[in-house]
Regions:
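Compact soluble domain cores
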Residues: 2-60
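Short, compact, well-ordered microdomains
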Residues: 58-97
């Protein structure tokens, strides 16, 4: 079974394997800006002990046009009603970026 970091990287890099939800603040941007922001999320590799203490690659932030952008991956059960009991198990976990 893949580990949490691998599953998170797959979602983040391909935007496949979970849901991608954009905040209102991102959704109101021009399509080219949204595409650039998503590209920065996909290519993010500045993981440190400070922003990734568990080595799961589930959070990051970067500057875009003078604005701080944050992204996060959360783990839900298959109904999206509760947190997943085991984020390492894709059979019982849905990821949301």
């Amino acid at each position: 079974m893949p580990d949490i970091k691998t599953l998170n990287n797959n979602l983040r890099k391909t935007l496949i394997g979970g849901r991608v939800v954009l905040t209102q603040g991102i959704n109101v941007k021009m399509p080219k800006d949204i595409a650039r922001i998503l590209a920065k999320v996909r290519n993010f590799n500045n993981f440190t002990k400070a922003n990734d203490p568990y080595g799961e690659h589930d959070f990051g932030s970067f500057d875009y046009n003078g604005e701080k952008i944050y992204w996060k991956i959360d783990y839900y059960d298959k109904s999206y009603q509760h947190l997943s009991e085991n984020p390492a198990n894709p059979n019982i976990t849905n990821r949301v970026l």
